[in-house]
Amino acid sequence: MKDHLIVFDTTLRDGEQSPGASMTRDEKLRIARQLERMRVDVIEAGFPAASNGDFESVRAIAEAIRESTVCGLARANEADIRRAGEAIAPAARGRIHTFIATSPIHMEMKLRMSPDQVVEQAVRAIGWAKEYTDDIEFSAEDAGRSEIDFLCRIFEAVIKAGAKTINVPDTVGYNVPEQYAHTIRTLIERVPGADKVVWSVHCHNDLGLAVANSLAAVMAGARQVECTLNGLGERAGNAALEELVMAVRTRQDVFPCDTRIDATQIVPASKLVSGVTGFPVQPNKAIVGANAFAHESGIHQDGVLKHRETYEIMRAEDVGWGANKLVLGKHSGRNAFRSRLQEIGIVVASEEHLNHAFARFKELADKKHEIFDEDIQALMSDEVVTPDQEHYRLVASRFHSETGETPRADLTLSVDGQETRTSAEGSGPVDAAFKAIEAIAGSGTELLLYSVNAITTGTDAQGEVTVRLAREDKVVNGQGADTDIIVASAKAYLNALNKLHSKLERLNPQL
């Protein structure tokens, strides 16, 4: 029987640290439920000590998720670990993931600690974590640039202290596959008690080698891979979950292990993360890109038509492509709408929130004859800010744009429940709408990105607009969808402003 390869997803923690990818609690819950549906083994739900918002998100996920292990990240200090322990307390299966830097440059320049002090602190951290759970993971930050003898020493110490999973992160994406595999193999051979723990890897993609390094480590004995959907993450991102899972599954002739992932949920999960974060998936992205199973060449098309395995090493339907279908229409009722939301992993915060979302759905159904899952997900992407967080909302709009005249936007906004009218002119209707909103919300916000995508086909398709706003050191993405692109743009801008308004300062740990 083959070994079980544990899939540890950190989309909600490391993935969220990608600039602009900040998520609300409800957005994180939607993704966590989809990860559970996909049968991910461990969900790293966040960094509870970073902010009250992060703590509440991790705790909400711990309360909601029953099948997957829910993990909270903590630095190797008592305050962080106690905060993580409190956050995961409601979980059916909870884990604390604690870390400390081990490379010479980090110990000297960042921690200002000696190697002896680092080992002592790591052991103390395991002791604090054991007060909350027996499932403890220890990471040596920047292990990829750490001295192998010191890694052996600190890993031996934390294993004796009670750590159950040992993670060897390539924090800055510096390693190459052969080198990384040698490191993992050496650690497993040299560290006393290595056979009593699960060896884990966490690779970054700075040199485009995150997946290759992770797979090389698996061949060397690692049995947990840490990854994110769509490879989302800081800088160049993390190892992509979908690529790791399908590489191992497709090449069972090579790999001595397999995952328990339901691969048919991969594409729906990818689309959900893309929609929530506003980070589009590149068309040629392996597994989840729109062109991943497209064949343009006549020779390839001929081969596939005669026998699909001539050019396809896996089936599109096995990873969730082709599963979308017409689900609702203008005559669908509230219960049918609620049921469909649940089926695609969307949980609303309250009956009030459901009523508001259903009203939006009925408005869409009057404009659009056929409504697909993508339409519902896009509609909900600017509904995930719960009513108490919705400081700005578009109530009504009117746009004037005639040849030779300056475009103008007249908007009615709800600001903390009070309706306010605002108008502005601009170089185009979108510019006018944004300036009208700024007249109410105030200036000081920089627009970093504006993009439009058609959600489905047809002339009545909704347009989904993504905007990225920056204010001081905060960067957020906002989404809005409508059959009218100008309205969608205004919704996206307001969605981003709501996120900026409620976003708390948070720490961004590096692993």
Curated annotation (Swiss-Prot):
Q: Which GO terms describe its molecular function?
A: 2-isopropylmalate synthase activity; acetyl-CoA C-acetyltransferase activity; manganese ion binding
Its main subcellular localisation, reduced to a broad class, is cytoplasm
SUPFAM superfamilies referenced in this protein's UniProt entry, alphabetically: 2-isopropylmalate synthase LeuA, allosteric (dimerisation) domain, Aldolase
Chain residue ranges for the region called Regulatory domain: 393-511
- EC number(s): the record gives 2.3.3.13
Q: From its record, what is one biological process in GO terms?
A: L-leucine biosynthetic process
Q: Give the reaction(s) catalysed.
A: 3-methyl-2-oxobutanoate + acetyl-CoA + H2O = (2S)-2-isopropylmalate + CoA + H(+)
Keywords attached to this Swiss-Prot or TrEMBL record, sorted alphabetically, are: Amino-acid biosynthesis, Branched-chain amino acid biosynthesis, Cytoplasm, Leucine biosynthesis, Manganese, Metal-binding, Transferase
The record's function comment reads: Catalyzes the condensation of the acetyl group of acetyl-CoA with 3-methyl-2-oxobutanoate (2-ketoisovalerate) to form 3-carboxy-3-hydroxy-4-methylpentanoate (2-isopropylmalate).
Identify its protein family. Answer: Belongs to the alpha-IPM synthase/homocitrate synthase family. LeuA type 1 subfamily.
Q: How does it assemble?
A: Homodimer.
**Entry protein name:** 2-isopropylmalate synthase
Q: Whose protein is this, by species? A: Aromatoleum aromaticum (strain DSM 19018 / LMG 30748 / EbN1)
